[in-house]
């Protein structure tokens, strides 16, 4: 009986080391599982970090234009600025160029004060004109012109001059007359007057006047009804 107990004890003791050897195996599996879990967590964190960085890069890239598109946008901006500058220059320069390119005849057709003419006179085609708007007879107008040096009552030279002066003073005496209805029309300088004068058949209408309808005749002593002025002329050689 003691032998059996001893054997059993030995067997039991012999079996105990096996059990003791199994326990380390259980510890190793627990450690390895823990390490795997830690590794998996670290891996997940790394992946999450990489994914976050990738998303940030994507958003950053979305806020920027690719180089070709950026270059195109810059070129379009430069073109717009150049075109706007050209339009502004055109708007500013066209009136200036038109004024400078206007012909001398066009410039002289405009009534304007001239430094070479007396004050309150106007210039047209190298001549100075004084527009007298007072109501006077033909004789009074002739005397008013004679009182000014180198001036005379106007005698029309051409159609352009006649239209120009009629636009300024629609009714005015001119330096043209006739002695009777049977005599020719002459200027105050004694030269034959070549332009047609309407209503010249009346015996008492021996003085000519400029009207919007052209040249007409009237009584030399008349200053009635229509406000008749007069035009004095002084011819000068004006510098351009």
UniProtKB/Swiss-Prot annotation:
Membrane topology: Single-pass type II membrane protein
Extracellular side: 94-240
Cysteine disulfide links: 117-128, 207-220
Tissues in which the UniProt entry reports expression: Natural killer cells.
One of the GO BP terms on file: positive regulation of natural killer cell mediated cytotoxicity
Keyword Ion transport in record: no
Protein name as annotated: NKG2-E type II integral membrane protein
Species: Pan troglodytes (Chimpanzee)
Lineage: Eukaryota, Metazoa, Chordata, Craniata, Vertebrata
Gene for this chain: KLRC3
């Amino acid at each position: 009986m003691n032998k059996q107990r001893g054997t059993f004890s030995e067997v039991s003791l012999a079996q105990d080391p096996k059990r003791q050897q199994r326990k380390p195996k259980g510890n190793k599996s627990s450690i390895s599982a823990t390490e795997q879990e830690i590794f998996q967590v670290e891996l997940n964190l790394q992946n999450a970090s990489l994914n976050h960085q990738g998303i940030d890069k994507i958003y950053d890239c979305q806020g920027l234009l690719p180089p070709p598109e950026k270059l195109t946008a810059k070129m379009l901006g430069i073109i717009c600025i150049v075109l706007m500058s050209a339009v502004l220059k055109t708007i500013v320069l066209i009136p200036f160029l038109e004024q400078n390119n206007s012909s001398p005849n066009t410039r002289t057709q405009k009534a304007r004060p001239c430094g070479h003419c007396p004050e309150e006179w106007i210039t047209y085609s190298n001549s100075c004109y004084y527009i007298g708007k007072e109501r006077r007879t033909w004789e009074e107008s002739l005397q008013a012109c004679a009182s000014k040096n180198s001036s005379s009552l106007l005698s029309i030279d051409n159609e352009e001059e006649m239209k120009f002066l009629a636009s300024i003073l629609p009714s005015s005496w001119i330096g043209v007359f006739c002695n009777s209805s049977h005599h020719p029309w002459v200027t105050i300088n004694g030269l034959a007057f070549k332009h047609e004068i309407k209503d010249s058949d009346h015996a008492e209408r021996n003085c000519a006047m400029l009207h919007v309808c052209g040249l007409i005749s009237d009584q030399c002593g008349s200053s009635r009804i229509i406000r008749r002025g007069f035009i004095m002329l002084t011819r000068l050689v004006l510098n351009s």
